[in-house]
Amino acid sequence: MMVLVRQIPEPEAPLLAKVFYGGGDPGPITATMAHVPELLEVALPFIGATLSPSALDWRTKEIVIVRTSALMQCRYCIDSHTPVALDSGLSSAQVHALRGEVDLATAFDNQRDLALVNWTDAVVGPGPVSDDSRLAAQVMFCEAEVVELTLLVGVTLLLNRYATSLALPVNDDVVARLASEGFSRS
């Protein structure tokens, strides 16, 4: 694929961006955002806060991230988060289902997980979220959870479009892990 935006290596990073490099390779999202350090320094803390540990557990967040990424067909995010989702406690069958490779009903039997997937699908989908979807979310999640889940979908959508538009490459270690776990590249 054509490289649209070069990843800035740490020695060449602008001063405002260097703090996000941690003395090494920060990954393609940070290394490309470094072209505009004044946006990097506001975007990454928000993205980090949304993706980091919170009242929502790691597994829940990975359900949202993988499902959103699959619906948006973001190869980079699906591939990068598949190992993370497995590490968060999701089974291989559940991750395959979130990726859209098998039926969700065969992999998930927990009503909260299914409600989470349905809320994610509703927020990602075109047009307004239906009253039925809102009611289903209200039954399963408290208000703070609905807010955080919705922001998580939104941040994931932003990253999906960013990674897809720039055709960001997936780390070689991730590609190897996908193969070792029996997952094909997206």
Where are the regions that the model predicts?
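Mobile cap/lid helix-loop segments that border enzyme active or cofactor-binding sites
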Residues: 1-58, 115, 179-186
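Iron-sulfur (Fe-S) cluster-binding segments and ferredoxin-like electron-carrier domains
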Residues: 38-40, 78-97
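Preference for long, well-ordered alpha-helical segments
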Residues: 133, 143-184
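N-terminal hydrophobic signal/anchor transmembrane helix of membrane proteins
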Residues: 63-81, 96, 147-164
